[in-house]
Amino acid sequence: MAEDDLCSLFFKLKVEDVTSSDELARHMKNASNERKPLIEPGENQSMDIDEEGGSVGHGLLYLYVDCPTMMLCFYGGSLPYNWMQGALLTNLPPYQHDVTLDEVNRGLRQASGFFGYADPMRSAYFAAFSFPGRVIKLNEQMELTSTKGKCLTFDLYASTQLRFELGELVRHGECKFAIG
């Protein structure tokens, strides 16, 4: 299947009729709660512990890239290198109504040092992941300026394990940041 066809299919699978970050958070929380029994160990079940010494639960984390990159990575089951040490994710929700796409792109470019974020379309698509125990919270944060001039701070996370299981992908779609 051609890359355009894959993108077309991917766009059809996005969350529909969600217009605010609160609605998206509720929708994702419900989906995450439905999956919880599948991703958390039950009593007396073994669990893989990452090299850092324990399982870390960060809730949903978001990856921002363009649709063709997303399709190539997901078709292959791996995250893209969007940071010099692997994949950079954040807890910034993709339907944040008081932040523009340009500002998000600026923050991602500054945080990652990735030249690809020079074009806002490089972060116009999101994927929400649930990575129990597979990410490291970085000491730095992404600071953005809202459309009202407020400083907004979001955490940054890194994953050097770029392979992912299909069940770790919770949602994906087109970002709905403010137009500015």
Swiss-Prot record:
It comes from Panax ginseng. It comes from the Eukaryota. The keyword Nucleotide-binding does not apply. GO terms for biological process: carbohydrate metabolic process; cytokinin biosynthetic process. Its EC number is 3.2.1.-. GO terms for molecular function: beta-glucosidase activity. It is an enzyme of class 3 (hydrolase). This is Cytokinin-beta-glucosidase 1. Coiled coil: none annotated. InterPro entries: Glyco_hydro_41 (IPR006065). Hydrolyzes cytokinin glucosides thus liberating free cytokinins. Keywords: Cytokinin biosynthesis, Glycosidase, Hydrolase.
